[in-house]
């Protein structure tokens, strides 16, 4: 995998390509940038997986998370809005990931709004309304659970599916996990996240 990066207004400094290996964030490549030189980072990759682009290894909040895959990937951003306004091209899995993230963000924003409302109601002791808000939160959680489950089962050829399964269903019962596994293609099951998911299932 080759990652070509353009960071507007970034004149000088290090830029790092990172990933998670054995639960630890590691640097897989880095380059010292000066005088508007091309930024090219590389990594060996067997199947699509999450990578991170970072300007400061001590600050995990200001990094770009993306799905890497074989081939050439281009990332365009700026120093001022490094991880909040960027464009990624060349990774079909990342395009799918962006769409998924946008849906989950809507769930999270709705949940935060309801939690804030519940705090406000608690201050004025509106207990009946608090119960209604909690019911809405429970309903939202259920809808998100079902969305994730439906997504994974309906997109068995997507390399994103086993990652969602790992993050959202690791604690689920064997029936749910078997259903998820049976929906995945052999290619996906043999990917990095597919193998991790399969190990979770074997330990049930």
Q: Which ranges hold each PLM region?
A:
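Preference for long, solvent-exposed alpha-helical segments and helix-linker "stalks"
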Residues: 44-50, 54-192
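Start-of-domain marker
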Residues: 1-81
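Generic alpha-helical secondary structure signal
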Residues: 14, 101-104, 197
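TPR/TPR-like alpha-solenoid helical repeat scaffolds
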Residues: 170-171, 194-204
């Amino acid at each position: 995998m080759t990652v070509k990066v353009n960071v507007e207004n970034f004149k000088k400094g290090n830029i790092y390509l990172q990933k998670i290996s054995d639960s630890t964030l590691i640097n897989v490549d880095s380059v010292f940038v000066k005088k508007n030189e091309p930024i090219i980072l590389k990594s060996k990759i067997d199947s699509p997986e999450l990578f991170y682009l970072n300007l400061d290894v001590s600050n995990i909040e200001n990094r770009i998370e993306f799905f890497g895959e074989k081939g050439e990937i281009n990332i365009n951003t700026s120093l001022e809005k490094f991880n909040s306004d960027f464009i990624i091209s060349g990774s079909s899995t990342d395009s799918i990931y962006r769409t998924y993230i946008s849906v989950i963000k809507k769930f999270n924003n709705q949940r935060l709004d309801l939690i804030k409302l519940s705090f406000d109601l608690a201050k004025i002791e509106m207990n009946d309304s608090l119960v209604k808000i909690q019911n809405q939160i429970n309903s939202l959680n259920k809808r998100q659970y079902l969305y994730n489950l439906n997504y994974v089962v309906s997109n068995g050829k997507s390399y994103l599916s086993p990652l969602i399964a790992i993050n959202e269903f690791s604690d689920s019962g064997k029936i749910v996990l078997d259903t998820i596994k049976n929906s995945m293609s052999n290619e996906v099951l043999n990917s990095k996240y597919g193998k991790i998911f399969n190990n979770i299932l074997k330990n049930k």
